[in-house]
Amino acid sequence: MIPAWVDGGLTPVEKLEVHQKGLKHKAVSVFLMQGEHVLIQQRALEKYHTPGMWANTCCTHPLWNETDGDCAQRRLQEELGITGIPLTYRDTIEYRAEVGDGLIEHEVVAIFTGQAPDSLTFTPNPEEVMATQWIRFNDLAADMARAPENYTPWLHIYLRDHVTTILGGDR
């Protein structure tokens, strides 16, 4: 059950139902950085939407009554096995995107960033993540322009409309 707006108020709703009906719902997105590089992940083929597509470091929906910050840390650990990196809340944004098979993400997203040490090692959960890559934001944007079909709709939105939010005005 994830927090979604129904009749103007937040209520717990099954995740698949939220996406089938395109309900506005809470979400969290994390961007881990190492200097000029951001960690991106290729979603596992078993994911029920956007399988095999590249996305930001991790993203998810908070559980009912879970804080956004706790959710971000939980999902870093569940998807990538990463713990102990302090995260900075950047802002909350809203977007709506079709993600295939009649499913819709209409998210109110808390954006978090973190600085990963050069010594960071991690083991992705193969049920969630097929591959990872450290890439410069400029190179990521260029590759997304060359092969947009390889990237999730929300990553396109983040890079098109919210880079300053993600980077905190650092670049």
Q: Where are the language model's segments positioned?
A:
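Acidic, metal-coordinating catalytic segment for phosphate/diphosphate chemistry
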Residues: 1-29
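A short local loop/turn or secondary-structure capping micro-motif enriched for an aromatic residue
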Residues: 19-22, 47-51, 131-132
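Nudix hydrolase/Nudix homology domain
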Residues: 14, 52, 93-94, 103-171
